[in-house]
């Protein structure tokens, strides 16, 4: 531990063995709160490398139970959170719609830290059992193409270190790790990050973890694809990383103001979700979700480009099938 701390104090990247040792100790609660605080802050100041992030994620996954084997190339659109802008739950609503279109969505998430409503909060408030046992989860997924994996059930180190991390008043490597440690190990990911500078780092981490296809995005300071501003993207395709910017024009959608996406409380988030699924949501809410679903369709080769993905999603919403789909998820999550 002393060698690890000294390396970080001198702003040196840790090698793979040191990262694996460090996170194994963290998992087994062999690191004191003072040491953990020092390590997280030193990593933050140095800047976490993609190798440190990917090896830490691999170590955490090795200690996380895998609830079932699907035999599919699963998809996740879990983001880092932490943008503090208190918008509707874009990625969670997008995951519900995408799964109703047949995409195999394994949604990894937790409760809110910086927003009014995290993915777990929204789903729970909608009536979904977010703490499904492995049998319930597999059954729900097989019948709906949607499964929610509540992070604290699979990663105790996150849960136990949460009070300390909260007292640091800064984002740490744990924020980056959240979207990378889905126990079902999805092969396709749409991953939002709270800072544009993380896009390339996280894309490299996904590549190192063996993800086949991904897009890491930051849209106007949010960890989502947005229509009110430029979305910076790093796309992992054919084992190469392509870096580019997206705007509303790339989706053939109109721009909307960020303020229209912001909410005052969790109740508003629930209502926004239900309205979108029933195809009666505000245009600003619906269209930003549609852009994110379109990106999932593109990444999974169901749409040839983003504009086709948008048209497919808009046509699907007209059927109101996503709302019926949600009711089925709610019922099966409690079965």
Curated annotation (Swiss-Prot):
InterPro entries to which the protein is assigned, alphabetical: Anthranilate_Pribosyl_Tfrase, Glycosyl_Trfase_fam3, Glycosyl_Trfase_fam3_N_dom, Glycosyl_Trfase_fam3_N_dom_sf, Nuc_phospho_transferase
Top EC group: transferase
Annotated positions binding anthranilate 2: 165
Alphabetized Gene3D superfamilies for the sequence: Nucleoside phosphorylase/phosphoribosyltransferase catalytic domain, Transferase, Pyrimidine Nucleoside Phosphorylase, Chain C
Catalysed reaction, written as an equation: N-(5-phospho-beta-D-ribosyl)anthranilate + diphosphate = 5-phospho-alpha-D-ribose 1-diphosphate + anthranilate
Single biological process term from Gene Ontology: L-tryptophan biosynthetic process
Residues bound to 5-phospho-alpha-D-ribose 1-diphosphate: 79, 82-83, 87, 89-92, 107-115, 119
GO cellular component: cytosol
The record's free-text note on cofactor binding: Binds 2 magnesium ions per monomer.
This enzyme's EC code(s): 2.4.2.18
Domain of life the protein comes from: Bacteria
Annotated binding of Mg(2+) 2, by residue: 223-224
Binding site for Mg(2+) 1: 91, 224
Subunit structure: Homodimer.
Function in brief: Catalyzes the transfer of the phosphoribosyl group of 5-phosphorylribose-1-pyrophosphate (PRPP) to anthranilate to yield N-(5'-phosphoribosyl)-anthranilate (PRA).
PANTHER family membership: ANTHRANILATE PHOSPHORIBOSYLTRANSFERASE
Record protein name field: Anthranilate phosphoribosyltransferase
Gene from which the chain derives: trpD
């Amino acid at each position: 531990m002393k060698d690890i701390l000294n390396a970080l104090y001198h702003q040196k990247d840790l090698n793979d063995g040191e990262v694996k040792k460090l996170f194994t100790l963290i998992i087994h609660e062999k690191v004191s709160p003072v040491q953990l605080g020092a390590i997280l802050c030193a990593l933050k100041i140095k800047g976490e490398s993609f190798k440190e992030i990917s090896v830490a994620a691999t170590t955490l996954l090795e200690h996380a139970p895998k609830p079932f084997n699907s035999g599919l190339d699963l998809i996740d659109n879990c983001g880092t959170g932490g943008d503090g802008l208190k918008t509707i739950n874009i990625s969670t609503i997008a995951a519900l719609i995408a799964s109703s279109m047949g995409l195999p969505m394994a949604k990894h998430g937790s409760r809110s830290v910086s927003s009014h409503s995290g993915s777990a909060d929204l789903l729970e408030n909608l009536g979904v059992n977010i703490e499904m046992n492995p049998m319930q989860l597999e059954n729900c997924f097989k019948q709906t193409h949607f499964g929610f994996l509540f992070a604290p059930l699979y990663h105790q180190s996150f849960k136990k270190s949460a009070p300390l991390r909260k007292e640091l008043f800064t984002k740490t490597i744990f924020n980056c790790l959240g979207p990378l440690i889905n126990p079902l190990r999805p092969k396709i990911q749409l991953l939002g990050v709270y800072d544009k500078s993380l896009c390339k780092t996280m894309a490299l981490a996904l590549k190192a973890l063996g993800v086949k296809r991904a897009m890491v995005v930051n849209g106007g300071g949010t960890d989502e694809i947005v229509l009110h501003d430029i979305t910076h993207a790093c796309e992992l395709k054919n084992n190469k990383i392509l870096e580019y910017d997206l705007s509303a024009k790339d989706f053939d959608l109109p721009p909307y103001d960020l303020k229209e996406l912001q909410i005052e409380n969790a109740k508003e988030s629930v209502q926004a979700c239900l309205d979108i699924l029933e195809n009666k949501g505000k245009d600003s809410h619906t269209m930003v979700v549609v852009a994110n679903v379109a990106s999932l369709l593109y990444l999974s080769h169901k749409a040839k480009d983003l504009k086709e993905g948008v048209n497919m999603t808009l046509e699907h919403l007209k059927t109101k099938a996503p709302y019926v789909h949600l009711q089925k998820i709610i019922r099966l999550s409690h079965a």
